Amino acid sequence: MEEYQHDNSTTPQRVSFLYSPISSSNKNDNTSDTNNNNNNNNSSNYGPGYNNTNNNNHHHQHMLFPHMSSLLPQTTENCFRSDHDQPNNNNNPSVKSEASSSRINHYSMLMRAIHNTQEANNNNNDNVSDVEAMKAKIIAHPHYSTLLQAYLDCQKIGAPPDVVDRITAARQDFEARQQRSTPSVSASSRDPELDQFMEAYCDMLVKYREELTRPIQEAMEFIRRIESQLSMLCQSPIHILNNPDGKSDNMGSSDEEQENNSGGETELPEIDPRAEDRELKNHLLKKYSGYLSSLKQELSKKKKKGKLPKEARQKLLTWWELHYKWPYPSESEKVALAESTGLDQKQINNWFINQRKRHWKPSEDMQFMVMDGLQHPHHAALYMDGHYMGDGPYRLGP
């Protein structure tokens, strides 16, 4: 016993292996520095002669896994105490077995967290691989070409010609690559659920294409009607739309018209309010051209008969001026006028009748003599005979 006590008195005190609380790491650094400077000071929470090597190792582990701090077990100062806080009559430091078990628990929790992280990454990779596998099944399905065609048909509706050409070329290129790379799918490896999905999706795309096509066709028909109406009004063909091949419909136009329209904008001529009447007239002329031409000729002949030659009219006007007081030619004078003018008796009679109605008004003496002649036919006869005897002024008989 004396030798054992002597050894204890000469041997320095051993270090306590108890762990400090995780939340007090900064405090541990300060206390470890103090213990290195003064090994005989017993005021430290970790006991005399505490070395800061363990504390530095724990601090390094926390720096490596900062996101795992919430998963580590929380300890308190009441769970782990230093040797000088416990009653010890012999003043010898006591070693507790909780240190080794706490170290094992710490590493087990850390490894469990790492394992959970790896499992989450593996699950994400599995999800990505599942999506890629499903895509490969859809592409290798026999109905995929039908599905692709229905989808591209929907994209072509209302698209410009260059876009339609690019879509068609892309589809042909894709089908060529699929025929070279995709193996044939056996009947045993087919998925009934995938087959049902492909059929339903193809039907949905076909119906969607029909719904898109209907308003486009109605709009095209409306524009064609507008074109025809504008063409009828303007007497020239007007084309609002272009052919599917991108060329203009106005193939028969001259080079000057094509150069004028090369700007891309269609200039509409001014609308004539009488264009509709002219269109109707042209239509009737085409339908009744023979009858109208004969009728026109007949009407022109009648007009020519009603209009006397200029020389004949001049001779009749000369006789009219000489006999203005009483412009009634006798039968002999009518014959003479007919021979000189080349007209017939009917034309001469009609000309004098119209001329007297329009340009002659008898004087009051003439009106009185005419009225008196109605009462005395003998005087009227003398007047008429004396009037036509010469071209000079005449007297009335008794």
Swiss-Prot record:
Compositionally biased residues, Low complexity: 23-56
Please give the SUPFAM superfamilies that the UniProt record associates with this protein: Homeodomain-like
Q: Which domain of life is it from?
A: Eukaryota
Spell out the InterPro entries in the cross-references.
Answer: ELK_dom, HD, Homeobox_CS, Homeodomain-like_sf, KN_HD, KNOX1, KNOX2, TALE_homeobox
Enumerate the CDD domains for this protein.
homeodomain
Location (main, coarse): nucleus
Q: Where would I find the ELK domain in this sequence?
A: 279-299
- Where is the segment annotated Disordered? 20-61, 78-102, 241-273
- Tissue specificity note: Expressed in the vegetative meristem. Present in the base of flower primordia.
Q: Which Gene3D superfamilies does the record match to this protein?
A: Homeodomain-like
Q: Name one GO molecular function term.
A: DNA-binding transcription factor activity, RNA polymerase II-specific
Q: Where is the composition biased (Polar residues)?
A: 87-102
Task: State the conditions that upregulate or repress this gene.
Answer: Negatively regulated by ASYMMETRIC LEAVES1 (AS1) and ASYMMETRIC LEAVES2 (AS2).
The keyword Lipid biosynthesis appears for this protein: no
The record's function comment reads: May play a role in meristem function, and may be involved in maintaining cells in an undifferentiated, meristematic state, and its expression disappears at the same time the shoot apex undergoes the transition from vegetative to reproductive development. Positive regulator of LATERAL ORGAN BOUNDARIES (LOB). Probably binds to the DNA sequence 5'-TGAC-3'. Able to traffic from the L1 to the L2/L3 layers of the meristem, presumably through plasmodesmata.
Q: How does it assemble?
A: May form heterodimeric complex with the TALE/BELL proteins BEL1, BLH2, BLH8/PNF and BLH9/PNY. Interacts with OFP1, OFP2, OFP4, OFP6 and OFP12. Interacts with CCT7 and CCT8. Interacts with KNATM-B. Binds to AGO10/PNH. Interacts with BZIP30.
Give the record's family classification. Belongs to the TALE/KNOX homeobox family.
User: What protein is this chain from?
Assistant: Homeobox protein knotted-1-like 1
* Organism from which the protein derives: Arabidopsis thaliana
